[in-house]
């Protein structure tokens, strides 16, 4: 399977499994799961050729582990990053490491300094335990800036953290007082 096919399919899956399942007539359950046969049929109606082998390759080879297959192999979901109102994955609370990181573009700094980190259209703010990963995310949006989050103090102050299956740390918001430009 060539890299371009995997990347294009990953982008398509991110769109329909995180944000717009209706675009192909797909229904997600409350945990974000979609029936694979319905996904394949919806993609075909949209002019996209998907099959179980391609979906398995995307799940297996995605460097950020964005997708998961159910134990029975009949369903697929994005593990985090949802903006769809019907999806509310019940992540277990987790104790974060002392410091987490968030990558952003410099053009967003004024808003972050004023409001902190907010999820925007997503359900959660996404954080990383690795500086390099956070910087990579920031590069997608422009000139990258690395923010250091005092996750220990934030957690002690009562803010909940969760860790998605792919290792991404999630929280509802990050108040300004817990953010430092690294």
Curated annotation (Swiss-Prot):
InterPro entries: Ptrans_KptA/Tpt1 (IPR002745), RNA_2'-PTrans_C (IPR042081), RNA_2'-PTrans_KptA (IPR022928), RNA_2'-PTrans_N (IPR042080). The keyword Disulfide bond does not apply. GO terms for molecular function: NAD+ poly-ADP-ribosyltransferase activity; tRNA 2'-phosphotransferase activity. It holds the Pfam family PTS_2-RNA. Its EC number is 2.7.1.-. Keywords: NAD, Transferase. Signal peptide: none annotated. It is an enzyme of class 2 (transferase). It comes from the Bacteria. GO terms for biological process: tRNA processing; tRNA splicing, via endonucleolytic cleavage and ligation. SUPFAM superfamilies: ADP-ribosylation. HAMAP family: KptA. Belongs to the KptA/TPT1 family. Removes the 2'-phosphate from RNA via an intermediate in which the phosphate is ADP-ribosylated by NAD followed by a presumed transesterification to release the RNA and generate ADP-ribose 1''-2''-cyclic phosphate (APPR>P). May function as an ADP-ribosylase. This is Probable RNA 2'-phosphotransferase.
């Amino acid at each position: 399977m060539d890299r371009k096919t995997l990347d294009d399919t990953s982008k398509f899956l991110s769109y329909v499994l995180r944000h717009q399942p209706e675009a192909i007539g797909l229904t997600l359950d409350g945990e974000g799961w979609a029936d694979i046969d319905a996904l394949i049929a919806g993609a075909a109606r949209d002019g996209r050729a998907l099959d179980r082998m391609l979906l398995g390759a995307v799940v297996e080879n995605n460097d950020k582990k964005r997708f998961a297959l159910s134990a029975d192999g009949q369903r697929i979901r994005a593990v985090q990053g949802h903006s769809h109102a019907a999806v509310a994955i019940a992540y277990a609370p987790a104790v974060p490491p002392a410091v987490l990181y968030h990558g952003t573009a410099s053009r967003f700094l004024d808003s972050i300094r004023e409001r902190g980190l907010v999820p925007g259209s997503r359900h959660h703010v996404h954080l990383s335990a690795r500086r390099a990963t956070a910087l990579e995310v920031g590069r997608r949006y422009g000139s990258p800036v690395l923010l250091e989050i005092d996750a220990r103090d934030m957690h002690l102050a009562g803010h909940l953290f969760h860790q998605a299956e792919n290792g991404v740390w999630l929280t509802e918001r990050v108040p300004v007082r817990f953010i430092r430009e690294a």
